[in-house]
């Protein structure tokens, strides 16, 4: 009798284990099918009008079809301007995306990259150039408004000294974004590589991303 009970107990345990394993697998499959969202705003710091492209990436297809007309998500963005914000929905399992930029007029000067998205991401996609080479970079938006000042961070195409209120606060790194710095004067409170950065088109109390080069400001984008 004891042997029978032991046999039944073992069978029950094995059945429960199989059921729990099955539930776990189902849960993971469900997570992979959940709908996620991301937002991307496109910054064209190049010297020409540009189209920005986005397309879901798969391991098998690579960059195939990225520059097809159907993948344009922000068209005819003027030089040194910010394009529209693109809302992108995807299944959790398909969280890789290809991004590209090209000359709007010629269709040439193509640059591309890929990145992995997180649900709820709010991103800047920046097209920039250094020493004749074009690049795309993706950084997260980060609004940090401060009363009575311009709160700014800088994305640079090289290494430049940054002065705030006449004092050096940092040196930029190529393709990287700095921390935020509080600037109290819109006309001459900020200098990059010896160039005064005019912030007077902005508003006190707001935060901004500045794309800069050796000659100063190229794009000013509201966070």
Residue ranges and their predicted role:
Residues 1-10:
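Bacterial N-terminal signal peptides that target proteins for export
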Residues 10-16:
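Hydrophobic helical h-region of N-terminal Sec-dependent signal peptides
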Residues 18-22:
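C-terminal motif of bacterial Sec signal peptides marking the signal peptidase cleavage site
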Residues 24-27:
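Bacterial signal peptide processing site
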Residues 36-49, 137-186:
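Surface-exposed interaction/gating patches
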Residues 52-108, 163-204:
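Tryptophan-paired
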Residues 102-134, 194-223:
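Structured interaction patches on ligand/partner-binding surfaces of diverse proteins
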């Amino acid at each position: 009798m004891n042997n029978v009970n032991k046999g039944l107990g073992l069978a029950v345990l094995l059945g429960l284990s199989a059921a729990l394993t099955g539930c776990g697998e189902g849960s993971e499959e469900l997570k992979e099918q959940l709908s996620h969202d991301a937002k991307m705003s496109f910054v064209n710091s190049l010297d020409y009008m540009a189209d920005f492209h986005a397309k879901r990436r798969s391991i098998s297809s690579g960059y195939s079809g990225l520059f097809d007309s159907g993948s344009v998500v922000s068209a005819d963005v003027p030089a040194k301007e910010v394009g529209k914000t693109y809302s992108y929905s995807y299944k959790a399992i398909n969280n890789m995306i290809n991004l590209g930029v090209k000359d709007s007029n010629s269709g040439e000067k193509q640059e591309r990259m890929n990145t992995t998205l997180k649900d709820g991401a709010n991103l800047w996609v920046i097209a920039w150039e250094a020493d004749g080479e074009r690049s795309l970079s993706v950084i997260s938006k980060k609004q940090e408004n401060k009363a009575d000042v311009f709160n700014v961070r800088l994305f640079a195409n090289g290494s430049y000294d940054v002065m705030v209120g006449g004092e050096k606060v940092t040196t930029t790194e190529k393709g990287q974004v700095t921390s935020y710095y509080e600037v109290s004067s819109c006309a001459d409170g900020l200098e990059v590589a010896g160039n005064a950065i005019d912030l007077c088109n902005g508003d006190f109390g707001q935060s901004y991303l500045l794309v800069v080069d050796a000659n100063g400001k190229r794009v000013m984008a509201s966070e």
